Amino acid sequence: MSMQDPIADMLTRIRNGQAAKHVSVKMPSAKLKIAIAKVLKEEGYITDYAVADEAKPELEVTLKYFQGQPVVETIQRVSRPGLRIYKGKNELPKVMGGLGVAIVSTSKGLMTDRTARQNGMGGEVICYVA
């Protein structure tokens, strides 16, 4: 089976792992996935992440719970291989009225919508997390 959208696969593994109350989830590693995990950790949506550098690098994401409930309520892919979504600095969406974050790929790397707005940058909207 070929994987057409590895980012959607990562988000689905996180969503399913939290629904099943797993401590962590493992997936094939890639630079973009590591960057997404870094942003999720900085925003407090996951506890930690680690890359096991073996023959096939594997990314392990440690999930976060608060009072037994998953911290991530929704995690949704926006821009996908078949339909890329780009937004300018003034068009960046506010997820759940500012309570959630949109992860945006800019020329300066991956960042949240708030950081991109502060830096006056737009880019490709990768996903929404709330």
Swiss-Prot record:
Keywords: Ribonucleoprotein, Ribosomal protein, RNA-binding, rRNA-binding. Pfam families: Ribosomal_S8 (PF00410). One of its GO terms (molecular function) is structural constituent of ribosome. GO terms for biological process: translation. Gene3D superfamilies: 3.30.1370.30, 3.30.1490.10. GO terms for cellular component: ribonucleoprotein complex; ribosome. PROSITE patterns: RIBOSOMAL_S8. The keyword Ribosomal protein applies. The keyword rRNA-binding applies. Belongs to the universal ribosomal protein uS8 family. NCBIfam families: PRK00136.1 (NF001109). One of the primary rRNA binding proteins, it binds directly to 16S rRNA central domain where it helps coordinate assembly of the platform of the 30S subunit. HAMAP family: Ribosomal_uS8_B (MF_01302_B). Part of the 30S ribosomal subunit. Contacts proteins S5 and S12. This is Small ribosomal subunit protein uS8. It comes from Shewanella piezotolerans (strain WP3 / JCM 13877). The gene is rpsH.
